[in-house]
């Protein structure tokens, strides 16, 4: 059986930057998980004493706080700045961009449509920068019964599929006078999604490695599953089952943007140890 990695996969720029920052700072607390990968979060806690707190209210005697890659709300940031604590911002620059756009467009009188999951921490943070009105949607159908204003700005959660974003944009163009569209989908998302599509079309089994709470990993899995029925989403090599690979000729592997190479290599090694001819 051939084992092939996607052309683009794994750690993105923003995650690499955050991990490096956390390792250098040490002895700190992150507000929410730094990234969506439980194994890497455990490694940072064990080796660098970087612990995870659920929210700002959980801070007690910590001297250093790291803002997660997904960012935090504007209100939480203001609250954090009032505390006697050193702040290190690990928000991904691709996430900071829609925050800034929302703030500026609001000042100019635009209401904002955010294409994304309203429960995702990134989207909560982005929405908090809107001072007019924000509409968080996952489908154009959610906009059909809304009385839209004459001026709308549109941004996307960084990990969403571009074609779905364009469905929202095309709907709005037909419904309102002025639409300002900002492409806030991360470049790494484009590349990883294109790569897994290409690989899954020629594979008869696919393994996607990443946190099951990771939005970008779930998107990769959905693309793989569309093209390759026998696609599996795992967090570690412990979840692999030999029967997945029996009678298979081509195994494709990809990984989410928060998945470190050391986990991916363990997955490959275990699949190789199954010794599927």
UniProtKB/Swiss-Prot annotation:
Enzyme Commission no: 1.17.7.4
InterPro entries per UniProt: LytB/IspH
Ligand binding ((2E)-4-hydroxy-3-methylbut-2-enyl diphosphate): 36, 70, 120, 158, 214, 216, 258
Keyword Chloroplast among UniProt keywords: no
One record GO biological process: isopentenyl diphosphate biosynthetic process, methylerythritol 4-phosphate pathway
Presence of keyword Iron-sulfur: yes
Entry's transmembrane regions: none
Reaction catalyzed: isopentenyl diphosphate + 2 oxidized [2Fe-2S]-[ferredoxin] + H2O = (2E)-4-hydroxy-3-methylbut-2-enyl diphosphate + 2 reduced [2Fe-2S]-[ferredoxin] + 2 H(+); dimethylallyl diphosphate + 2 oxidized [2Fe-2S]-[ferredoxin] + H2O = (2E)-4-hydroxy-3-methylbut-2-enyl diphosphate + 2 reduced [2Fe-2S]-[ferredoxin] + 2 H(+)
Cofactor binding mode and count: Binds 1 [4Fe-4S] cluster per subunit.
GO molecular function terms noted in the UniProt entry: 4 iron, 4 sulfur cluster binding; 4-hydroxy-3-methylbut-2-enyl diphosphate reductase activity; metal ion binding
List of residues binding dimethylallyl diphosphate: 36, 70, 120, 214, 216, 258
Binding site for [4Fe-4S] cluster: 12, 92, 186
Essential cofactor(s): [4Fe-4S] cluster
Entry function: Catalyzes the conversion of 1-hydroxy-2-methyl-2-(E)-butenyl 4-diphosphate (HMBPP) into a mixture of isopentenyl diphosphate (IPP) and dimethylallyl diphosphate (DMAPP). Acts in the terminal step of the DOXP/MEP pathway for isoprenoid precursor biosynthesis.
Family: Belongs to the IspH family.
Name listed for the protein in its UniProt record: 4-hydroxy-3-methylbut-2-enyl diphosphate reductase
The organism of origin for this protein: Campylobacter jejuni subsp. jejuni serotype O:6 (strain 81116 / NCTC 11828)
Gene it is expressed from: ispH
